[in-house]
Amino acid sequence: MKNWGSSDSGGSEDPPQEDSCLDPLDGDPNSRPVPAKPHIFPTAKSRSRLFGKCDSEEASMDCSYEEGQLASCPAITVSPVVMIPKHEDGPTCARQPSQDSVTAGSEKSLKLYDRRKIFEAVAQNNCEELQSLLLFLQKSKKHLMDSEFKDPETGKTCLLKAMLNLHDGQNDTIPLLLEIARQTDSLKELVNASYTDSYYKGQTALHIAIERRNMALVTLLVENGADVQAAANGDFFKKTKGRPGFYFGELPLSLAACTNQLGIVKFLLQNSWQPADISARDSVGNTVLHALVEVADNTADNTKFVTSMYNEILILGAKLHPTLKLEGLTNKKGLTPLALAARSGKIGVLAYILQREIQEPECRHLSRKFTEWAYGPVHSSLYDLSCIDTCEKNSVLEVIAYSSSETPNRHDMLLVEPLNRLLQDKWDRFVKRIFYFNFFIYCLYMIIFTTAAYYRPVDGLPPYKLKHTVGDYFRVTGEILSVLGGVYFFFRGIQYFLQRRPSLKTLFVDSYSEMLFFVQSLFMLGTVVLYFCHHKEYVASMVFSLAMGWTNMLYYTRGFQQMGIYAVMIEKMILRDLCRFMFVYLVFLFGFSTAVVTLIEDGKNNSVPTESTLHRWRGPGCRPPDSSYNSLYSTCLELFKFTIGMGDLEFTENYDFKAVFIILLLAYVILTYILLLNMLIALMGETVNKIAQESKNIWKLQRAITILDTEKSFLKCMRKAFRSGKLLQVGYTPDGKDDYRWCFRVDEVNWTTWNTNVGIINEDPGNCEGIKRTLSFSLRSGRVSGRNWKNFSLVPLLRDASTRERHPAQPEEVHLRHFAGSLKPEDAEIFKDPVGLGEK
C-alpha cells in the first residue's frame, strides 16, 4: 500500500477503490512514470494530527493502487500522475494530458473554472467540485494566485476563503488547494497571500487559523511555508477610537497571545520549520508584551489571562534567549511594557509587573520583587526600581503623574507598592522641607505685594516720582519685588505649558493651580504696562492680581493632608456643582431681566416716588438714585438682590401691568432663591460624601506631582545624592554574573499569606546589613510600622548624603538563599521545638 503523503513505497494488499482507477497507459505498464508524491504531510505525526489516521491504518484521504492492475486499462500517453484527494472515498488520480495526446484530450470536454465557482466550492467544503482544477490550471497554464482567481476589491484568495469557511473546525479543500499550489509552483505565494484592501490589509491564512483557534491548520500552514512574521496592519487591526476593530500587535505570535492560546504561542516559538521572533515589533514598535498590555481592560477575567500569558511568554523567552531583555524593549514612543501599562491605566497589569516574583531558579532574574526575609506574617521585600524612579527616562512615576486626566485609574495606580512607599520616602527625606520653605517665601512675597499695593500713591498720574524718603524706598522696593515675582510665575507657566501641553480638560482638572498662577502673572504684567502708559486703570489690574495671589495660597495646602483634601473638595464643587448652577442661574437671570426691562417705561411716575422707595435713602448725605431702570444692567443688579434675599418688590414704579410685573418677580424668586440655591446646597453635600475617598487620592496625586517637580529642579548630581533605595545583589544573571539591582525595601504584614512559598529568605529576619540605612515605613493598612518593630529604624537618607560624598558607594551584597520545599499543615508540629525555627 502507498499512503498518500507517506515517504514509504510499500505495496498494498487491499484492492483498489473504484473511483481511484488510473487512466490507461500506452506501451508497457511497467515502464510508466512513477506517480509524484505530494508533500503536504511530510510526517506521520502531522498527517494523523489533521485526519486522525496513521500508517498502520489507511486514512480517509489515502490512495491505494497496485501496479499490476494497470495493464487491464486502455493505454494512452499522459503526464505524471497527480493525486487529488476526495473527502469521502479517498483520492482520485487525475492526469494532465501531454502535448502528444491533444487529439485524445479533445474528445473529452475540459471543465472550466472561474473565481466564483472555486469560491463556492471551498465555501461548501466540496472537494469533488475541484477534482479537475489542477488539470484546468495546467492546461491553461494558470495559477491560483492569478488576479482572475482573487477578489478584485479585497485580494481574497481561495485559500483565505476556505479558511473563513470551516466546518467543525476543518475544511477538506484546504490541503487540496495547497497540493494544487505545490504542483503549479505557487505554494509559497498562496500560503502567504494576504488581503490588499485598506481595512484587512496584511491578514494571511495564518492569522485566520490562529483567530479560529485551530492548531491543526496552524501547523499545516507553518509546515508549508507560512510566514510567521506577516503583519496584519489594516485599519481593522489598528487601535483607533470610535472605529470597530481589534488591535493585537499585527503579528501571528501577538495574535495568539492576545487571544489566550498558549499552545499556539509555544508552537510558533519552538517549531522546527520557522520559529517566530519573540522580540519582533509591529508598525508602532510594540512587541508581544506591549500587545498584551494593550488588550488588557482591567476586568478580573481579562487581567487574569493577560498576566498569566505575560508571565509564560517572559519565562519562555528567557529559556529560548537567556541574554535577551524582552521586558526592556521599547516601542516608538520610548515606552516599555511597564511604562505602557502606567500610561494606559492598566492597573492590574501594572501591579503584576511591579510585584512579580518568580521562584524558578533559572528564571529568577526576571523577578522585580525579592522577598529578603519573612517571619510569620511579616515580610521584607526588595523592589527593583529600574524603570520606576525618576532617574530614568519615561519612568513609571513620571508617566502616571504627568499623564492625561483621562487616563483611567490614574489616582489608584500611585497606591500600588512600591510607588506609594517610594513617594512617601521622597517626601519625608527632603521634599517636604523644600516645600515648606517655598511656602514661607510665597507668604513673604504676598505680604510685600499687599503692602506695596496698599501704600500706592493716589495723587496724579503714573509713573510717580520717587520721593527720597525711607517709606518711598521701601514702597519702590516692594513694587520691584512684586513685579519680579510676577515675571517668575509667568515664565514658570510658559515652561509648564510647553512641557506638558495640557488639553483643555486637563487644564481645568489637573492644572488649575498652574493656570491661576499664570493668570496672576498676566495681571501683574498688565499692571506694569498700564502704569508706564500713564493709565490709572493699572490699579484695577493690580487688585485682580492681588486677589488671585491670595487665592493661590490654596496651592500650598497640598503639603498638609487634611487641608489638601479640603482644597480638592472645593475645587471639585466649583468645577462640578457650581458651574452647573451658574449656567442655569444665568439663564434665569437674563430671561427674567429682559422680561422685566420690557415692562419698565422711562419717564412714567418719575415725579411721584413711593414711600417704600424713599425710606431707603433717608439719612445724612443720602439721596435717591436715578429711578430709571430701563436698562438691562440695572435690572440684572436688582434681580440679583432677590437671589441673595435683599430684593424689593417695589424697587420701581415705572411699569405697566403691575400684576404681570409682580408675577414675574415672584416666579424669579421661587426659581432662584428657593429652588436653585437649595439644590446647590444639596448637591454640594452629596458631592462631599461621594468624593471623600476620591479627594484623598487626588490629593496624593497632587503631592506626587509636587515631589517630582521638586526633584526635577535639582541638578543631576543632587538627584543621585537624594536617590531612594540601595544597590544590592539579588542573585545571578543567566551568564553567571552577579545581578545587582537598585532596590527599595518595603516591610509588609499579610495575615492571609504566610511564608510557606517564599522563594528567597534571609536566615536572620530584620538583622540585615543596610537596613539601618534604608527606610522602613509605617504602613497604616497591612504594613509594618518602623516604630512598632524592634529591629526597624527610621533614619533619613539625607544623613547619608554626606557619607556618600566621603565614601564612594559600593554595591551592597545581600545574601539571599532559596527556601527549598514548602511547609504543609502537618509539618507545623516541628515548630513547637525552638530549634525548628532555623539556624541563628
UniProtKB/Swiss-Prot annotation:
Motif interval(s): Selectivity filter: 645-648
Annotated spans, Disordered: 1-43
Pfam families for the chain: Ank, Ank_2, Ion_trans
Transmembrane segments: 434-455, 474-498, 512-533, 537-557, 561-599, 658-684
Residues that, per the record, bind ATP: R116, K156, K161, N165, Y200, K201, G202, Q203, E211, R212
GO MF assignments: ATP binding; calcium channel activity; calmodulin binding; excitatory extracellular ligand-gated monoatomic ion channel activity; extracellular ligand-gated monoatomic ion channel activity; intracellularly gated calcium channel activity; metal ion binding; phosphatidylinositol binding
Record-linked PROSITE patterns: ANK_REP_REGION (PS50297), ANK_REPEAT (PS50088)
GO cellular component, one term: dendritic spine membrane
Binding positions (Na(+) 2): G645
Segments on the Extracellular side according to the record's topology features: 456-473, 534-536, 600-631, 654-657
Intramembrane bits: 632-653
Intervals holding ANK repeats: 111-139, 154-186, 204-229, 250-277, 286-322, 336-359, 394-416
Annotated Ca(2+) binding sites: D648
Name of the featured protein: Transient receptor potential cation channel subfamily V member 1
Organism phylogeny: Eukaryota, Metazoa, Chordata, Craniata, Vertebrata
Gene that encodes the chain: TRPV1
